[in-house]
Amino acid sequence: MTIAIGKPEEKTSWFDKVDDWVRRDRFVFVGWSGLLLFPTAYLALGGWLTGTTFVTSWYTHGLASSYLEGCNFLTAAVSTPANSLGHSLLLLWGPEAQGDLTRWFQLGGLWTFVALHGAFALIGFMLRQFEIARSVKLRPYNAIAFSAPISVFVSVFLIYPLGQSGWFFAPSFGVAAIFRFILFFQGFHNWTLNPFHMMGVAGVLGAALLCAIHGATVENTLFEDGDGANTFRAFNPTQAEETYSMVTANRFWSQIFGVAFSNKRWLHFFMLFVPVTGLWMSALGVVGLALNLRAYDFVSQEIRAAEDPEFETFYTKNILLNEGIRAWMAAQDQPHEKLVFPEEVLPRGNAL
């Protein structure tokens, strides 16, 4: 009689082998999200560096070109494709470039390349935070918070131009290009008077205020530990005990404002809620602009201002400023439209 001792070998599938490799504990965690994040982030960043350093883009936009043509870090950009190309993906092997790399660069193919790979890289980074949080049994609030800048990127660089006539109306990837796009938004959409923009500003500036107050309050209420009780000398970075006094901080702000956060959970949730909600709201506003929705047009004031030259409000001044921005930008931005503005809508010296 023969007795077999031991367990039969279990056959592992290819999926289990890949899962074991990507989630293995190493210096830089890869994970399933890394299969999306690392290649797309590498290609997006590499495309941007290539575009701003070597590739000329006068063909498509006239806003900026490469360092080789005299631009600096502020003015160089990966420019958007021409308006005539609409929403084409501008694939290198597509009908526009037909496999010609130089032609692809000239047409603005790098912009769609950077925009799409950049969007997937940001999504991959958010999924990475989900994956690591799940593996170490944390809540996923980091990933949820990171969805806010992703929503802004996607709404500005993808959804807005999709709602317009082409990628041409998205921002180019550069510093001066982004500021120019902001002026464009104001001139053509009166963006600063949009309530979603107001909520976004409140979220970003409110978050900065909360961050400054929180940091200062923690520094103010550090427990003394030794003779040199300051931020940098008196504390062991691996100490297990509490570093600052929430009770003292609560008492301080109760005396200042009459109210204060009662516990750390509510305090830190509020610091999460303010900027994330603000960015989400601003992204919603940009989606509205993609559809050319108007917000807060005070038509009665415009009619009265047209009838009475003496009538002037902040709003009517704003309208004149927007007209000036449009007149200044349109000829360069949209030469194919052959726009001609009548005398009465052009900026009028000191009238502004």
Swiss-Prot record:
Entry GO terms, CC: chloroplast thylakoid membrane; photosystem II
Entry binding sites for Fe cation: 214, 268
Subcellular location(s) per record: Plastid, Chloroplast thylakoid membrane
Principal cellular location given in the protein's record: plastid
Cofactor-binding details, from the entry: The D1/D2 heterodimer binds P680, chlorophylls that are the primary electron donor of PSII, and subsequent electron acceptors. It shares a non-heme iron and each subunit binds pheophytin, quinone, additional chlorophylls, carotenoids and lipids. There is also a Cl(-1) ion associated with D1 and D2, which is required for oxygen evolution. The PSII complex binds additional chlorophylls, carotenoids and specific lipids.
Binding-site list for chlorophyll a ChlzD2: 117
Binding-site residues for chlorophyll a PD2, renumbered to this chain: 197
Its job: Photosystem II (PSII) is a light-driven water:plastoquinone oxidoreductase that uses light energy to abstract electrons from H(2)O, generating O(2) and a proton gradient subsequently used for ATP formation. It consists of a core antenna complex that captures photons, and an electron transfer chain that converts photonic excitation into a charge separation. The D1/D2 (PsbA/PsbD) reaction center heterodimer binds P680, the primary electron donor of PSII as well as several subsequent electron acceptors. D2 is needed for assembly of a stable PSII complex.
Name of this chain's protein: Photosystem II D2 protein
Organism name: Pleurastrum terricola (Filamentous green alga)
Lineage of producing organism: Eukaryota, Viridiplantae, Chlorophyta, core chlorophytes, Chlorophyceae
